[in-house]
């Protein structure tokens, strides 16, 4: 879906070593088909190898890396040891440093470049000014990538132990339960079953993060030196991938032509389920503007379209029934 709606590349996970353990990840045969499909469209596939593996997992890495060498367009890596192993066992594949590695300065970026990295996905905590300075002090051959849309983590670039502590599911091994996005109530020890809402207007909203949206700031990101934009897509619906990818495709193309963003594409990003949007750490520290907890969406799926008639009009094959007084707007 992402490729159909304008993505230049997609990232996906194999059966192991990916940061979405509960997702329907790709086995070897599915991976081969996905890579062939993307390459047939002139697009690229980056395979995630971005968990922090434990000692007893290292023996499986060489075979995993050798299997992908020369077929995947890049490997996304979050561990220094895995980066070294990838240079040895996947010498024909470009190496991308994951945002999980927390790169936030030029010294780290240069060191990783010397270790063989082709691309560094900067930490979400990097500001616009940080990016400008990193670009000015790194080799031009090193590509810089940045997340521009998706969830914000309460910990530094996703290195969080909250999920592990509360559920036994390790966020650093692809099993995050996202407890930072749960709704919590307070129960007093001697009043079991009585739950009190937590209201703390004078305190912290760290467990209540917003979603990042940078579609309005694409020209500035390009000017700062970002070579590619990354959208959170795994564990999202096909609808989400289509809507958000399409909006950013038009936003990027407009920026490259020197044209302003059309309001319709900003409006499109409101049509998926999301938390209130913010610009992350790009311009300042988010601080206390994490005040609203609920997800929101301003649109429902009204029909599924699988074909067009001879005049290019959509032919819906299934419908969602509208309730009384609801309207459907044709775009």
Regions found by a protein language model. Give the residues of each.
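Anionic-ligand-binding alpha/beta catalytic cores of soluble enzymes and soluble regulatory domains
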Residues: 130-133, 142, 232-292
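Glycine-rich, proline-tolerant flexible connector loops at the mouths of alpha/beta enzymes
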Residues: 11-29, 49-56, 235-239
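Conserved small/polar residues in nucleotide/adenosyl-binding loops
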Residues: 320-327
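Hydrophobic faces of well-ordered beta-strands that scaffold small-molecule active sites
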Residues: 10-12, 45-49, 75-77, 95-99, ...
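Conserved, mostly hydrophobic/aromatic
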Residues: 2, 79, 112, 146, ...
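Active-site beta->alpha loop and helix N-cap motifs at the rims of alpha/beta catalytic domains
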Residues: 25-89, 94-99
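Catalytic alpha/beta core domains of metabolic enzymes, predominantly
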Residues: 94-224, 241
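Active-site-adjacent beta->alpha loops and helix N-cap segments on the catalytic face
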Residues: 23-32, 80-86, 125-138, 238-240
């Amino acid at each position: 879906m992402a490729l159909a709606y304008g993505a230049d590349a997609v990232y996906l996970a194999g059966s192991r070593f990916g940061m979405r353990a509960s997702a329907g990840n790709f086995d070897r045969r599915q991976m081969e088909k996905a890579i062939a499909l993307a390459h047939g469209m002139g697009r690229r596939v980056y395979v995630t190898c971005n968990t922090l593996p434990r000692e007893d997992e290292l023996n499986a890495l060489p075979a995993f890396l050798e299997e992908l060498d020369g077929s995947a367009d890049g490997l996304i890596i979050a561990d220094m040891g895995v980066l070294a192993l990838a240079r040895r066992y996947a010498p024909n594949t470009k190496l991308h440093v994951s945002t999980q590695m927390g790169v936030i300065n030029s010294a780290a970026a240069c060191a990783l470049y010397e270790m063989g990295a082709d691309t560094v996905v900067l930490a979400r905590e990097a500001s616009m000014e940080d990016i400008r300075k990193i670009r000015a002090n790194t080799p031009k051959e090193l590509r810089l990538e940045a997340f521009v849309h998706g969830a914000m983590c309460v910990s530094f670039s996703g290195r969080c132990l909250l999920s592990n502590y509360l559920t036994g599911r390790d966020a650093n091994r692809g099993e995050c339960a996202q407890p930072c996005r749960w709704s919590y109530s307070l129960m007093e020890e001697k009043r079991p079953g009585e739950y009190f809402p937590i209201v703390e207007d004078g305190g912290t909203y760290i467990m209540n993060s917003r979603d990042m949206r940078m579609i309005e700031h694409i020209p500035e990101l390009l000017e700062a030196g970002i070579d590619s934009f990354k959208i959170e897509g795994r564990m999202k619906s096909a609808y989400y991938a289509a809507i958000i990818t399409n909006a950013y495709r038009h936003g990027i193309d407009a920026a490259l032509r020197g044209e302003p963003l059309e309001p319709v594409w900003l409006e499109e990003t409101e049509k998926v389920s999301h938390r209130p949007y913010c610009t992350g750490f790009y311009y300042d520290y988010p601080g206390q503007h994490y005040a609203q907890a609920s997800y929101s969406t301003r649109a429902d799926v009204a029909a599924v379209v699988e074909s067009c008639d001879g005049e290019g009009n959509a032919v819906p094959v299934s419908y969602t029934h509208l309730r009384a007084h609801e309207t459907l707007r044709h775009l």
